[in-house]
Amino acid sequence: MSRIGKSPVQIPDKVSVDINGLTITVKGPKGELKRLMPEGVDFVQKENQIVVTPSTTKRYSRERHGLCRTLISNMVQGVTDGYSKKLEIVGVGSRAQVKGKTLVVSAGYSHPVEMTPPDGITYKVESNTNVTVSGIDKEIVGNEAAKIRSIRPPEPYKGKGIKYQDERIIRKAGKSGKK
């Protein structure tokens, strides 16, 4: 059995969970998330917690045990607190701004790159070089942050580009001159 899957998911008072077969709906103060879980796992709601158990002893069932528990836990945390990813833009002349809902990034190309957020995602820009992506679905927040980073990934020589705030860029030495 999965060590992660063994621990039950605690449900706060403000959150309601509806289990309908393999579809789990979580409603909370920040919104509602709905997800279809993979087969091979059973869900039981007891008072203010959800217990996830593998339905069989087969490998595919045991593989999905911890995954489903973590997905439910992420949904509960998303509707209560939400998720956010912070990115930094490094480089002369590189900046970002929000126009309406779209994020406009000037990252050294001949044109600014515009990104429209999917439903439930918001962009926030502080001081032209710090971008915060926030929402209730951890997966979508991470994907949107990765898309923004892929506009201009950080390069190892000068460190220019878009990077996560806590990301360390391993620097390389430049070419040495003729000797």
From Swiss-Prot:
Keywords: Ribonucleoprotein, Ribosomal protein, RNA-binding, rRNA-binding. GO terms for molecular function: rRNA binding; structural constituent of ribosome. PROSITE patterns: RIBOSOMAL_L6_1. The keyword rRNA-binding applies. Pfam families: Ribosomal_L6. It comes from the Bacteria. Disulfide bonds: none annotated. GO terms for cellular component: cytosolic large ribosomal subunit. Transmembrane segments: none annotated. One of its GO terms (biological process) is cytoplasmic translation. This protein binds to the 23S rRNA, and is important in its secondary structure. It is located near the subunit interface in the base of the L7/L12 stalk, and near the tRNA binding site of the peptidyltransferase center. Part of the 50S ribosomal subunit. Belongs to the universal ribosomal protein uL6 family. This is Large ribosomal subunit protein uL6.
